């Protein structure tokens, strides 16, 4: 992985292969809380680099993204970091000739939700793992109007034994909805224009499922039998180009 700089921040970049159906595509992976580009690459076991596309690993300020939750007691919120603007400029800097995909885990997943609302059309499809939509009173973006919403294919993956972000919803830096309510919310916004798919995994914790899945007692059960990267690859392959 090459470490590069955009603006005042580092990011990791792994170029895709010279040939193949996804050679012109780019995946922007947003890490979870306290992670860096290097840490999140290990945490995902580099699985998304097997999709045959380039992968970029940007870093949040103080290892957090200023996501859309109203309650976020982290330095990036204290500083008023504008990650919507930063990530929009970051994505456009690549001048991608293929499709642009966004994916995030936990805090990174919440940042994806914010981008879907405040930077509509930035991604051609998105993936969120281990994060559910905040409750309305805990969500900073204003409800989207029809002319401000861009239907975006969305794959949601959530562990049924996640101790950090419960699948039934609860309090995770403020109120959060269930995984099912999250899927229903985005289906209402997308209508028939773009699919929303929810995959729930039994005996799976706050992890990125896949071979070599990294976990701990704090994060809950690992899942090496389901490959989140492969699921996303199958999801985007079903989309019309």
Question: Which sequence ranges carry the predicted segments?
Answer:
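Serine-hydrolase catalytic machinery in alpha/beta-hydrolase-like enzymes
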Residues: 4-101, 110-114, 118, 209-218
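Hydrophobic/aromatic beta-strand patches that form the interior of the parallel beta-sheet core
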Residues: 28, 56, 101, 127, ...
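Short beta-to-alpha linker loops that shape the active-site pocket of alpha/beta-hydrolase fold enzymes
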Residues: 59-63, 132, 204
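Active-site rim elements
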Residues: 73-78, 164-177, 216-224
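Conserved alpha/beta-hydrolase "nucleophile elbow" surrounding the catalytic nucleophile
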Residues: 104-106
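Conserved hydrolase catalytic core segment
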Residues: 114-124, 134
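The feature captures the conserved acid-bearing segment of alpha/beta-hydrolase catalytic domains
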Residues: 125-194, 203
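C-terminal catalytic histidine-bearing segment of alpha/beta-hydrolase fold enzymes
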Residues: 155-157, 175-177, 184-241
